[in-house]
Amino acid sequence: MIFSTLEHILTHISFSIVSIVITIHLITFLVDEIVKLYDSSEKGIIVTFFCITGLLVTRWVSSGHFPLSDLYESLIFLSWSFSLIHIIPYFKKNVLILSKITGPSAILTQGFATSGILTEIHQSGILVPALQSEWLIMHVSMMILGYAALLCGSLLSVALLVITFRKNRKLFSKSNVFLNESFFLGENVVENTSFFCTKNYYRSQLIQQLDYWSYRVISLGFTFLTIGILSGAVWANEAWGSYWNWDPKETWAFITWIVFAIYLHTRTNRNLRGPNSAIVASIGFLIIWICYFGVNLLGIGLHSYGSFPSTFN
């Protein structure tokens, strides 16, 4: 009873903080960025991280098993993973690009998990026999950490593509205007050229930063995903007598692994870095959501215990 009440309190606190942080983000987005407000939102995410940590520990103690047995618990852990990735650049103060992705990801995931949509599966139940194994922590935690890192890295690649597309589009339109004006304003040609060069330099620097951090975060996520798949195969052999059963979840996890293996391969080729490898990562972003969330909507296969309740099928 005590643990249930504590869990209920932590859930409401985290949801309230998330709501406040979302409001702050909207204000700083619509109005010129206010440093104090932005810093408050960053601290709010850190407080949310500790609330989620307390929620996971409380649920673990009350249920007697690590809280990764259903969709609700995995969403909470996914939000915790986003928050963990977010905290590292926050304290380093020099990786603001990454925090721009991890912050909103943690907020939205936690907001969805603690909203009323998944009320029916908030209560922790008894583990099905297949999940009563020490491999639960190793396999599922590695998979969720992998999803979190890969999603963050993929979003950085999406941002890279958007900026590159806008850059090419604006350069084409502005070059025409610049050439036309040059005939009438010959004395301003040098000043205009200097302005465009400076602007393009900073944009190129941003694209390089996005590409660099996308590669690093995806490499980390790929490592987690690989460990998760291998540990899952060992667990499957112990539980079902086979390392691989081509279950829908297993199949899509394998597809996810292949897509990001292709990304890492293209990223090592200098001619394919930047937009080309970012396209592969962007495709991977969609594949991850199909693997993690889409398969759960079907509620079929050996991993159906993690699906939505019957009212959503």
From Swiss-Prot:
Q: Give the transmembrane ranges.
A: 9-29, 44-64, 71-91, 111-131, 143-163, 217-237, 244-264, 278-298
InterPro entries, from UniProt? Answer: Cyt_c_assembly, Cyt_c_biogenesis_CcsA, Cyt_c_biogenesis_CcsA/CcmC
Subcellular location per the Swiss-Prot or TrEMBL entry: Plastid, Chloroplast thylakoid membrane
Read off the Pfam families from this record. Answer: Cytochrom_C_asm (PF01578)
- Bilayer disposition of the protein: Multi-pass membrane protein
User: Which GO molecular-function terms appear in the entry?
Assistant: heme binding
Biological-process GO terms, alphabetical: cytochrome complex assembly
Cellular component, GO annotation: chloroplast thylakoid membrane
Entry keyword annotation includes Plastid: yes
Q: Which UniProt key words apply to this protein?
A: Chloroplast, Cytochrome c-type biogenesis, Membrane, Plastid, Thylakoid, Transmembrane, Transmembrane helix
Q: What quaternary structure, including any partners, is listed in this protein's UniProt entry?
A: May interact with Ccs1.
> Into which family does the record put it?
Belongs to the CcmF/CycK/Ccl1/NrfE/CcsA family.
Q: List the HAMAP family.
A: CytC_CcsA
Protein name as annotated = Cytochrome c biogenesis protein CcsA
Q: Name the source organism.
A: Solanum lycopersicum
Q: Which gene encodes it?
A: ccsA
